[in-house]
Curated annotation (Swiss-Prot):
Its main location: cytoplasm. Keywords: Amino-acid biosynthesis, Aminotransferase, Cytoplasm, Pyridoxal phosphate, Pyridoxine biosynthesis, Serine biosynthesis, Transferase. This is Phosphoserine aminotransferase. The modification N6-(pyridoxal phosphate)lysine is found at K196. Pathway: Amino-acid biosynthesis; L-serine biosynthesis; L-serine from 3-phospho-D-glycerate: step 2/3; Cofactor biosynthesis; pyridoxine 5'-phosphate biosynthesis; pyridoxine 5'-phosphate from D-erythrose 4-phosphate: step 3/5. Belongs to the class-V pyridoxal-phosphate-dependent aminotransferase family. SerC subfamily. Catalyzes the reversible conversion of 3-phosphohydroxypyruvate to phosphoserine and of 3-hydroxy-2-oxo-4-phosphonooxybutanoate to phosphohydroxythreonine. It is an enzyme of class 2 (transferase). GO terms for cellular component: cytoplasm. PROSITE patterns: AA_TRANSFER_CLASS_5 (PS00595). InterPro entries: Aminotrans_V_dom, Aminotrans_V_PyrdxlP_BS, Pser_aminoTfrase, PyrdxlP-dep_Trfase, PyrdxlP-dep_Trfase_major, PyrdxlP-dep_Trfase_small.
Amino acid sequence: MEKVFNFCAGPAMLPVDVLAQAQKELVNWNGLGTSVMEISHRSKEFIKVAEESEQDLRDLLAIPSNYKVLFCQGGARAQFAAVPLNLLGGNTKADYVDAGYWAQSAVEEAQKYCTPNVINTIIDIDGKKAVQPASEWALSDDAAYVHFCPNETIDGIEINDLPVTDKPIVADMSSTILSRKIDVSKYGVIYAGAQKNIGPAGLTIVIVRDDLLDLASQALPSVLNYGVLADKESMFNTPPTYAWYLAGLVFKWLKSNGGIDAMETHNRKKAAVLYDYIDQSDFYRNDVHSDNRSLMNVPFQLANSELDTKFLELADEAGLKALKGHRVVGGMRASIYNAMPLEGVEALVQFMKEFEEKYV
């Protein structure tokens, strides 16, 4: 079988070692004679999985003790509603920093429950998309919280600053969690869909500061209530146990490979290889200013867009999968999350060189 590298934006590739272990344990986990997906979420065996995975995540991110870690369902889109319904309290206003599609999607949902103050942060620098410095964001004084998405997967835009505010900061880290070091204590809530850097689709991680657990609207469904989920240790209803188990394997894989510091070094090296090649070429281009280029999602365009279909067709034949850009922006996009090895990025760059030589 040819070697395949999956550049899908999500669900994304998982570490090969994790998949191999899951395959080995699929029908007979821990000598029980059953799969881990078949056992009760309240069994002592699965409780151990749950406790270990939470502790490993706490270790990886250095999560302070005054934060709860919730293993939820519904994806990040469910959190677009859960955040205002959990955090507004008696307020009706919240700040939303807008740098792209996913921030805008969060705003659209939040409008059902509050009046968002939307701060458009995208600017143009030398013909490239960039993000305003956080010190220039027009945040309000009376917001319940400030929401932002540090990494916009579609445009490949990364926000490196934190909002300058004394309000709780809420971050949609679906595409950037575990890819680089963060200081969790600076956030009120962090949430992330699992299907990029954590595990398979179906699981969502929420990290929430204790003092924010008692603000929920009375109309909030219990399955989205952070306080309820914290009290029930993420088992108010049956959780996605197999996705939880796989996330636990990914956390152990990260720890065994040097943790977040090593992963950030690895990710910066991968991204540099790809961006450096694009920048020296007249055949390819990236439209994001270097200060705000994503480490995880690298969109690029061909000088001749009529060659897009041929590029994607030949790339697929070469084992370079899922490179088609999002329908909103077109072109190509290479998503190079934690599980993508440097070898995969180097293979993509080599293919790009050969394609350019043939079609320039």
